């Protein structure tokens, strides 16, 4: 009996910890250091100049994503200078600025000297011509050494993405890629995963491993990866931009997330998204590359941008996703040069109004999504009871008006039951003793309750 009581106390402590966590809403701020270095200015709502990392944290952002390039100095920017943005020193600085504000850290390793994306997965210059075996050693050593440097600097990432939008290949000499090359591509992924695993073991860290796809290819690629034995990861990250998406509704995205989560038992997160708030004004002469919302009918206004983000967050949350990250909301115009221009080709998609001194736009409200979510779901949650609790053979869901889809997960997040309630009763006789979360899908909302199996 004492052992049972001790177990129940530990389980309740774990539940309290879980309940303190919430849906992640964060930002990719990879360019922010360089924007600041080149004179970029950010203001708060009162018009006071402010630090962007401080502002995002104060507004409620809970995670910062930063990309890492191997040797960006191999590229000459539009102003004629070697590019140093997003080298390892820059990543360390960005992570320090984010961590001191209490935000979690998400790193995207591109395994290239510049942007890698669906059309390009070019390896670092220093790896050109290596045999497959030596290339694998290089991938392992590079991945491990990056994590070691970050850990030494006190900014160990919470999530590491192995590759960025790897739609048609991974770490190739050619650009664009020639398509997948199995099993060699599996070797590349798996050696990088092994580097993270070994680092975690040696340093007692718990960095999560992610892959990163686009919305249009995520379903196909997840299946392909499993077929090719690329499975040792925790998170599937998805890029979803209305401008680039083939989808014509957010429900299509929600269906994708639910399918990926239930089929592969992985956490699903939107790693990149973005929507313009204007397409009629410009802060500089660097042409903007995103001027509309594709198949989605959100108006190109500050309120339209905000409405899209809240609808997106609701969709991802209701589908079982763990969060969304907005791509480069702090990329305002400055003297910064990249490979193609000077200034920003994205200021019309940022979270700052360049027509009003770079004051924050309404889109910043998305970082309070957890607060609005809690208020919205509390009434439904308060009306649902699990009885008995603790329970041994079955639980009854009190307060339901009809049968609903349910999912039960253990304390590690593993799905142990995925079914429909029958007469509001769920058979739990075949699951081990322990603490569990039951998630009920009620009227397009997810209501979660905790219970103990004895």
Across the structure, where does each feature detected by a protein language model lie?
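Substrate-binding cleft and catalytic face of glycoside hydrolase catalytic domains
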Residues: 55-208, 214
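Bacterial Sec-dependent N-terminal signal peptides
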Residues: 1-21, 374-375
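Boundary/entry segment of secreted carbohydrate-active catalytic domains
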Residues: 21-52
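C-terminal outer-membrane/trafficking sorting elements
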Residues: 376-454
């Amino acid at each position: 009996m004492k052992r049972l009581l001790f177990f129940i106390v530990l389980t309740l402590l774990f539940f309290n910890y879980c309940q303190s966590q919430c849906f992640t809403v964060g930002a990719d701020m990879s360019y922010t250091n360089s924007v600041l270095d080149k004179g970029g200015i950010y203001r708060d709502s009162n018009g006071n100049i402010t630090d962007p990392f401080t502002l995002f944290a104060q507004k409620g952002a809970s995670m910062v994503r930063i990309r890492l390039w191997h040797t960006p100095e191999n590229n000459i920017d539009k102003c004629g200078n070697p590019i140093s943005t997003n080298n390892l020193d820059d990543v360390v600085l960005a992570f320090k600025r984010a961590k001191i504000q209490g935000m979690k850290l998400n790193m995207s390793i591109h395994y290239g000297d510049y942007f890698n994306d669906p059309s390009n997965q070019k390896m670092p210059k220093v790896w050109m011509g290596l045999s497959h075996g030596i290339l694998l050693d290089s991938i392992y050593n590079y991945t491990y050494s990056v994590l070691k440097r970050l850990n030494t600097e006190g900014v160990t990432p919470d999530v590491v993405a192995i590759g960025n939008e790897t739609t048609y290949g991974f770490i190739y000499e050619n650009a664009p890629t020639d398509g997948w090359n199995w099993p060699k591509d599996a070797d590349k992924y798996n050696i990088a995963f092994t580097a993270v695993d070994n680092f975690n073991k040696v340093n007692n860290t718990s960095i999560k491993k992610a892959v990163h796809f686009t919305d249009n290819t995520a379903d196909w690629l997840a299946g392909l990866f499993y077929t090719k034995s690329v499975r040792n990861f925790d998170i599937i990250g998805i890029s979803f931009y209305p401008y680039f998406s083939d989808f014509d509704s957010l429900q299509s995205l929600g269906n994708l997330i639910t399918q990926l989560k239930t089929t592969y038992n992985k956490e699903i997160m939107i790693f990149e998204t973005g929507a313009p708030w204007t397409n009629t004004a410009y802060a500089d002469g660097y042409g903007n590359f995103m001027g509309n919302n594709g198949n989605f009918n959100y108006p190109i206004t500050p309120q339209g941008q905000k409405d899209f983000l809240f609808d997106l967050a609701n969709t991802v949350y209701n589908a079982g996703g763990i969060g969304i990250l907005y791509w480069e909301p702090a990329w305002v115009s400055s003297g910064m040069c990249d490979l193609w221009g000077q200034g920003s080709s994205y200021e019309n998609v940022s979270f700052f109004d360049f027509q009003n001194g770079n004051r924050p736009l309404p889109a910043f409200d998305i970082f309070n999504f957890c607060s609005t979510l809690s208020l919205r779901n509390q009434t439904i949650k308060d009306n649902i009871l699990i009885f008995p609790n603790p329970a041994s053979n079955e639980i009854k869901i009190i307060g339901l008006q009809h049968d609903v889809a349910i999912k039960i997960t253990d304390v590690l997040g593993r799905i142990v039951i995925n079914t429909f309630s029958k007469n509001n009763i769920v058979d739990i006789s075949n699951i081990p003793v322990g603490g569990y979360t039951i998630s009920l899908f009620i009227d397009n909302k997810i209501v979660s309750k905790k219970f103990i199996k004895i």
